[in-house]
Amino acid sequence: MAKKVQAYIKLQVSAGMANPSPPVGPALGQQGVNIMEFCKAFNAKTESVEKGLPIPVVITVIADRSFTFVTKTPPAAVLLKKAAGVKSGSGKPNKEKVGKITSAQVREIAETKAADLTGADVEAMMRSIAGTARSMGLVVED
């Protein structure tokens, strides 16, 4: 028989930097999960990723207080800011442009996000990523 799921917890945790402080500690402690066990497992799983990059994680808490977790790819906005070399997006993206990004960089980000995005093909994912870039005030160049 399948184990009974108690809760799903969705968090964004910096790669290789999970620790018991908020937001990780309170979210897991509320469900009775061993916080240090999660932190060690998460840090081990994300050691190949650039340190400090926010990684979305979905933690499945089982009724016996054990857990499993699935990591996703970093948010597209974070990858776009990193590729463009900007600190933050534009407050007025239709008027003020904050940076430029090439279509090759958009393709690279789309291929990175391919596991998480439900787009039919790379071209569709590229259009989605380009739309995100435009909404952040980035210019997509060919």
Curated annotation (Swiss-Prot):
GO terms (BP aspect): translation
PTM characteristics: One or more lysine residues are methylated.
Keyword Glycoprotein attached: no
Pfam families xrefs: Ribosomal_L11 (PF00298), Ribosomal_L11_N (PF03946)
UniProt keyword rRNA-binding, yes or no: yes
Listed GO MF terms: large ribosomal subunit rRNA binding; structural constituent of ribosome
Entry keyword set: Methylation, Ribonucleoprotein, Ribosomal protein, RNA-binding, rRNA-binding
GO cellular component: cytosolic large ribosomal subunit
Gene3D superfamilies cross-referenced by the UniProt entry: Ribosomal protein L11, C-terminal domain (1.10.10.250), Ribosomal protein L11/L12, N-terminal domain (3.30.1550.10)
Function recorded in the entry: Forms part of the ribosomal stalk which helps the ribosome interact with GTP-bound translation factors.
Known partners and oligomeric status: Part of the ribosomal stalk of the 50S ribosomal subunit. Interacts with L10 and the large rRNA to form the base of the stalk. L10 forms an elongated spine to which L12 dimers bind in a sequential fashion forming a multimeric L10(L12)X complex.
Family note: Belongs to the universal ribosomal protein uL11 family.
Protein name, entry field: Large ribosomal subunit protein uL11
Species of the source: Proteus vulgaris
Taxonomic placement: Bacteria, Pseudomonadati, Pseudomonadota, Gammaproteobacteria, Enterobacterales
